[in-house]
Every structure is written in C-alpha cells, then in structure tokens.
C-alpha cells in the first residue's frame, strides 16, 4: 500500500499525486517505503516517551541522537535496505522500553501520552509490514481536507530535513538538549494527526526556526573542527593514480579516509555535496586530496561507472548502483543503505583502501580545469566591506542566491539559463548541489570580486543568511528591502526545511522550482504566495525581467 510524495520526482497524475505502486520513482520498493512509515511511527512514539521522561528529569543523550539519525534514514535517496529499516524499528522499540523501565523504577505514573504510544509492530519484517495501513503518512486521508494533509506532510518532511542536519551536527560533536526537546515535541505532536490549519502553519514555522538553530550548530561544528572555509581553487579533472571518491556530507568520514590513505599512493576526490570540504584549511594538509570529480547526485550512475576506483557514500544521495555495474566497489556509511552493498560500521576504511588498490585508477592526466569555492560565512564577512562599497558606487546592482538541490528534469536548465542571463553587474551566490548547473562556467569578476560565490553545502544557507543580515545592517534596511533575490531549486526534504527556515525568518519573494512540491495543494500554494510572496519559477527571461523591474 505504498504512498510516498516527499520528493520532486514523485508521480503526478490527474487522479492524484504520489508514488503508490510496487516501486517509487527513486527506486525505493513498496516494502521499504512501508517499513519507513512504520519506522516514523515508532520514532514518534519514542519521542512521546522522551518528553514524558524529561518531565521527570530523565534525559538520555543516546536516544536524543538516535531519533533524528533514524529519521534521516527515511529521506529521499538515503536507505533502500529493508533489513536496515527493520533494525532501526527494533532499536526504537528497545529505546522506548528503556525509558518505560526507568520511569517505572522511579515509580512514575505516566499520563497524557498520544494515542500512538504503545505501538507494537513486532520485530520481524512481515510483522512490521502488517502495520503499513496504520502508519501510512497519509493515513485518514478520506476523513480530512486535502489542505490539512498537505500541511501535515509539509511539517513531517520539513522535520525530516531538520533531523538530517541534526545528525550532521552530532557527528561533529554538536548536540543541544533544548533543540532535542523541541524536535521531540514536534515529532510527538505530529503523531496526533493534527487537523487545525493555523496550528499546522505555526508548526511549519517552528520547524524553520528550529532548523536555523541546527544550522548554527552545524556551522559551529564544521568551523571548529576544520577551520573557516577560504576562497580556494579546486581541480575538477582527474590525475593518474589509484583513487577513492567520497560523496555525501560527512567531512569526518573524509578526514578518516584521508588519514588511512596517507602514504598509499591513493588519490582522494570529493563528489557532489562534499566539494566544499576542499575549502576548509584542515583538509589542505593532505596532498593526496587532489580535487573534485563529477557533479550532482543524479549523474552518479554514469560518473561512478566511469570512476576507476572505490566510492564511499557518507550520506545522501545514493541511487541504484547496479545500473552502472559498480555495486561491488561502492560502500555505504551511517544511515545510507542499498541491498547487497557493503556497509561500513566504525572507523575502519581498510576495505575501501584494499578495493581502491585492486582497481586500475586513472591512467592519464586530463586537461586542467579549476573552479573557485570557499565563500562561506567568514569569507563573505571579510568581503562584505568591499562589496558594500561597490554597491554604493553603483558597480554592483543586485545579488542573486541561486542554488539548492539538483535533479534530472529538463526544466532544471532554468537555473543555468538564469545564472547566465543575470546582469553582468550582479553577484551570484550559490550553494547545495544545484550549483553544478553552472559552477564550471566563467562569470568573471567585478573589481576583483568573483561574480560567482560558492557558499558551500545546502546547510550553508546559514552563511548566506548572515551575509544578508550584514548587508541589511550596512544599508540600514530590512533584508526584504535589499537588492537580493533568492531563486531556490528543491528536490527533497533538506530543501523543504531550508525554505521553511527562510520563511520563518521573514524572508519574502523567494522563487522556487522547477515544480511545486506535489503534497502542497493549490490553496496552500496561494496562501504561501499571499503571506510570503513565494512564487514558482517560470522562464529565466521572464523572471529576471520581473525581478529587475521591481
């Protein structure tokens, strides 16, 4: 009874939206999809018990870490392995029992729990699947208005994005008890199937503000561990030698791989959202970190097939490795999973090293090509005075933030066209894997300031927000009064929560595309346009004309 509507590539038909057959458009089977719904339900139950325990002074950091991590496994293109999802469900049930036992030992009578608590799906795959109808994310759809269902899903998917960033922050040593409590509160509340429009809209904004705090934690974790990114020239063509490709967002894994490949003759390349790592001072101590290979996630079946070495997926996004016949040399980490692919636990990457040494590696040097990255928060703040002077002098007319998630729809050419057509006296900021639509093009500079400023990973929207705040302070105006336009490409749940963060902070007149999320009804989209000025993209030419005429 699969139903999944969380990503941009979901099925859209006149009869309704969402993947609801044997397999989703992402390659996720109905079995895995249903098990993920069971997992979400179990995690919401666990969150309710976490809140009850907190009321009596019982705080468990391990459980606070587990819930968002396991929730992360249900994001688009993260974990396709049913057995791993079953194991997460069982862990959730075990953690719940720990809390029940601890409260019983305190002779505490727990009351006021949501009806969903006490969920008992069993510990085996078939038993858990039997609960699919009870746990479906669109349960009760025939009894509630489609706008209510759309807002429930907006909150659920936004919270998934926040959970992913919480896990990224945790890996870097950043946990916050108040953030965890707010996360559990929203998880538990969503399990009650709320049906009041205003409360759901309020929750969506609360998720956005929660995520702002999480992005701040993640920024602190990355800069504490690796220093502040700095403008850096990065090679994007390979050199001869054995090789490992590291994709995803987890820079701690990249660090471990670099340590364990030192002196082996293996070259390490970043891929996708790992590209920004090359701008951090810490990683410049490793001469065998030679550059970035490939582009965004949707091209991996071709790029990984052509890569003559081992591949490590540290987080999203993974797609079917059997298509390119490289499943025997790709490895998954943390929450990532694909059936039949080797999953690595712990910090030992010797299997990856051995695989890389057994493969041919690159035989020839390709023509050098470099791009510039590293314009995250600190670099932007250092450049801000010069930028402000050029705005005052009339040399810079507008700022565009063009980025987000990439994808394979032809309509995404819009973002390439938009960047190329932007006025020559404008600056282009970009982040996320959406940057690959244009980050190898030469946009020139304005008085020594590159017109294209790569801010970093999708979560580095935090850096862009800090720049906007600095500019608004310098020009003594609100952020919405700046000559600044945000044009965001969305694909999955991280992009959803970043959008919620921007809206919760009061940022207006954002354009997003190439299509609207399928779970948002026309009425909800109208409300978002009326309240926030949120618009869908049309054509690059028409949108630019409208923006510049305002």
Swiss-Prot record:
[2Fe-2S] cluster binds at residues 4, 7, 19, 26. Its EC number is 1.7.99.1. GO terms for molecular function: 2 iron, 2 sulfur cluster binding; hydroxylamine reductase activity; metal ion binding; peroxidase activity. The modification Cysteine persulfide is found at residue 405. Gene3D superfamilies: 1.20.1270.20, 3.40.50.2030. GO terms for biological process: response to hydrogen peroxide. InterPro entries: HCP/CODH, Hydroxylam_reduct, Prismane-like_a/b-sand, Prismane-like_sf, Prismane_a-bundle. The keyword Oxidoreductase applies. Its cofactor is [2Fe-2S] cluster; hybrid [4Fe-2O-2S] cluster. Catalyzes the reduction of hydroxylamine to form NH(3) and H(2)O. This is Hydroxylamine reductase.
